[in-house]
Amino acid sequence: MRLSTPNLQLNEQGKLRHFLTIEGLKQHHLTEILDVAESFINPVTGDISKVPSLHGKTIMNLFFEPSTRTLTTFEIAEKRLSADVVNLNIETSSTKKGETLLDTLWNLEAMLADVFVVRHSESGAAHFIAKHVAPHVHVVNAGDGQHAHPTQAMLDMFTIRKHKGDIFDLKVAIIGDVQHSRVVRSQIQALSILEAREIRVIGPKTLMPSHPEALGVHVYDHIEEGLDGVDVIINVRLQNERMKSALLPSEKEFFNLYGLTKERLSYAKPDAIVMHPGPVNRGVEIDSEVADGHQSVILEQVTYGIAVRMAVMSIIIDNAKQLNADKQITKKVTEEARS
C-alpha cells in the first residue's frame, strides 16, 4: 500500500513532527536520527545513557498487534528518556467493546498524552491517527500492516553504519518475503535515501513485488547469485499471516532454496554482516550456525533499537520545543514592532 503523505510528518519548519514512514524524507532527516542515536551510546562501554530529555512527558504505547522486541525496546527507550510510560492493554481496552479507534484516541488524548507509539494491523493506521491528533501530540509508527516500519529500518541502518561506516557504496541483499514485509519496504527506502550502491532482493517470484523497478532494486531468483560480493545480508521472515493464499510449497522447500546457510554465506564478502529484524525462524530463513555465527549482528540490532527509538522520540519533542520557541520570538518581535 502506498501512502505518499510525507508532509503530514513534518512541521512548518520541515522538521519531524511525527515519524510515520521513511518515504518522502530527506537524507538529513535520517542522518540526524543516526547521529542522535550515536550520542546516547557510551563510546567506551557501549552502554546506553539515561537522560532527562522527556521528563514530564507522557508516552502511550498503543499496540493493536502482538509484539515482543518492538514494544519492549520502545518502553525501555522511553524510560531511558525519563518519560512517563503507559502501555494500552488491547485485550481489555474499550476497542474490544465496540469503541471506535478515534473515540479511544480522543479519550487517551484527554489523559494528556504527548506521544502515541502505534502498531496496527491495518496499513495507514498511523497516518490516520496522525491526521486526527491535537497539534501538541506526536505519533510514532511502530508498524502498520504491510505499509511501513520506519524505526526498524532506522535501527538496521544504524547497525550497518556501526559495522561498515558510511552506507554509501555498500551492496545490500535482502532475502525472503519482500512482497508482504513492511520492514523491507522501509529498509529499501532508507537504503535508497542513504545512497547504498546496490540493493538486491532474493526470493521466489511469488514473494517479490510486482514492479521491483519502481523500488530501485535488483531481483534475484537464485540465492548464490544474489549474494555474490555483497557487504550486508538481511534475512526477513515469511509473513504467513499476511498471505492471502499458499504462495510456497512448504517452509522446508523455502529453506532448501533460499535459507541462509554457511555454504551460501561464503558467496558474500568475507566480512559481510548478517542481519534479521526478528522474529527469527531457524531452519526456515536462516540456519542456526549462521544466526549464531561470528558474522551475525542480530542481537546488536535489538540493542541499537533502544538508542534509535530514543533518538526518534527526543527529536520530535525537541523539534516541537524549537518551533514553539521560534513562534514566541516572532510574536514578541511583531508586538514590539506594532507598539
Curated annotation (Swiss-Prot):
InterPro entries: Asp/Orn_carbamoyltranf_P-bd, Asp/Orn_carbamoylTrfase, Asp/Orn_carbamoylTrfase_sf, Asp_carbamoyltransf, Asp_carbamoyltransf_Asp/Orn-bd. Disulfide bonds: none annotated. Pathway: Pyrimidine metabolism; UMP biosynthesis via de novo pathway; (S)-dihydroorotate from bicarbonate: step 2/3. It is an enzyme of class 2 (transferase). Keywords: Pyrimidine biosynthesis, Transferase. Carbamoyl phosphate binds at R69, T70, R119, H149, Q152, G278, P279. Its EC number is 2.1.3.2. GO terms for biological process: 'de novo' pyrimidine nucleobase biosynthetic process; 'de novo' UMP biosynthetic process; amino acid metabolic process. GO terms for cellular component: cytosol. It catalyses: carbamoyl phosphate + L-aspartate = N-carbamoyl-L-aspartate + phosphate + H(+). L-aspartate binds at K97, R182, R237. GO terms for molecular function: amino acid binding; aspartate carbamoyltransferase activity. Catalyzes the condensation of carbamoyl phosphate and aspartate to form carbamoyl aspartate and inorganic phosphate, the committed step in the de novo pyrimidine nucleotide biosynthesis pathway. Belongs to the aspartate/ornithine carbamoyltransferase superfamily. ATCase family. HAMAP family: Asp_carb_tr. PANTHER family: ASPARTATE CARBAMOYLTRANSFERASE (PTHR45753:SF6), ORNITHINE CARBAMOYLTRANSFERASE, MITOCHONDRIAL (PTHR45753). Heterododecamer (2C3:3R2) of six catalytic PyrB chains organized as two trimers (C3), and six regulatory PyrI chains organized as three dimers (R2). NCBIfam families: asp_carb_tr, PRK00856.1. This is Aspartate carbamoyltransferase catalytic subunit. It comes from Hydrogenovibrio crunogenus (strain DSM 25203 / XCL-2) (Thiomicrospira crunogena). The gene is pyrB.
